[in-house]
């Protein structure tokens, strides 16, 4: 597609669109933004594997699809196994996988289908060393089935099975560190990314394409519906998650950590700035907020030390 010169000068993302209008995502959906960026990075030479999740519905009902790519729907827990099988089959048939001119096999699964139900298959994919990319789009609950908590749901959050109010059954466990579990497999490349920083996400997608072996990206993707947030605040919320160090951006490449924060020398903003835009946190007490703030800063300090020692 020919890009006008005046447009080209302003572009920081690829011009070509492979995620079309007519999809069924909710307004402000962070996952649909992320999927759009993936297809901008890799184009039509992509095989997407999507399990049961919001994105299964977003793509559209058969025989229609909003995705201009090869698409394989699979069972909830099997993303890691299916991308492993597709990669092995492509190689057996003589196709090049990964690299600039290779086919990109991409698993695209939510936090429930990754951190919980699909964790075993993810581990197998990583351990076997397949040339594919697994992306966990993290909206911090089982949104497609009715906003139930997952192990990626943060401390203090309301969900339909951790309700707030008088009985105060809010989530009392901290968010599972899936990226740490992945890094424990000592794969060549793993990273965190956010829909609020698309240039950073695109750069990491391109790096995952070039590096042989399994790659993993944990993508922060707000869900206004499940987070009880205004639909026009998706990017602001995602940006605040990074600026408060609740969801720091970093890379792990061949044993080395590198922090990718937009303002690395700036102190994190108070966690309240992230929380106050979301109705799911409205039942948190002052003590709850202090607990979450303490955890966020402890994890941020731990990451900085990892980057200092293994950078």
From Swiss-Prot:
Enzyme Commission no: 1.2.7.7
Alphabetical keyword list: Oxidoreductase
InterPro entries referenced in this protein's UniProt entry, alphabetically: PorB-like, THDP-binding, TPP_enzyme_TPP-bd
One Gene Ontology biological process: sulfur compound biosynthetic process
Molecular function as annotated in GO: 3-methyl-2-oxobutanoate dehydrogenase (ferredoxin) activity; thiamine pyrophosphate binding
SUPFAM superfamilies: Thiamin diphosphate-binding fold (THDP-binding)
The protein's name in its UniProt record: Ketoisovalerate oxidoreductase subunit VorB
The species this protein was found in: Pyrococcus abyssi (strain GE5 / Orsay)
This protein's encoding gene: vorB
